[in-house]
Amino acid sequence: MKKFVSVMVGLCLFINKPIYRKNIKKKESEAMLLEVNGYTFEVELENNTSAEALKEYVSKEKRTLSLDDYGNFEKVGNLGITLPRNDETITTKEGDLILYLGNKLCLYYNQNTWDFTKLGHIKDTAHLKEALGKGSVQVTLLME
C-alpha cells in the first residue's frame, strides 16, 4: 500500500509540474505595413540581416519617408539610417522593397536589374501604382 501511495503522490507531482520546452519559437504576429496616400499595403520581409535591421528600426516607431520618382520604375528616398547590406544582382518586380547603398529605400513599380539588397515585397500590388502616383510621395512604414 505504501508503494501505491508513493507512486500516486509522484504521479500527482509530475502532472502538476509545468512542462518547459526548449527551442519553441513564438509565432511572429507582427507584420510590416506601408502606408501611402490613404492605401495600406502589407510587406512580406525577406529573411536577411538587412530586413531584420529594418524591422527593428521600424518597431521603435513608425517611419515616414519622402520618396521621389527615379527612372520610371521606382520611388527612392533616404532611410535616415544605414542598414547592413546583402547585395546581389537581382531583377526587381512591382512591389519590391529594396535597400540601395545601405541607406536608401527603393519601392519598385516596374522592373530593373542591379546589385542591391531585397528587403521585402508588397503582398498585394493591385493598387500600388495608383497609390504612388507621379512625383514625390510620403510613405510611412510601421509594424502592426
Model-derived segments and spans:
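Generic secretory/membrane-interface signal
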Residues: 10-11, 27-29
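Sec-dependent N-terminal signal peptides of Gram-positive bacterial secreted proteins and lipoproteins
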Residues: 1-19
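Phosphate-binding glycine-rich loops and adjacent basic patches that engage nucleotide phosphates
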Residues: 17-18, 39, 58, 102
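Glycine-rich active-site loops that engage anionic ligands at enzyme catalytic sites
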Residues: 58-59, 63-144
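N-terminal secretory signal peptides
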Residues: 29-72
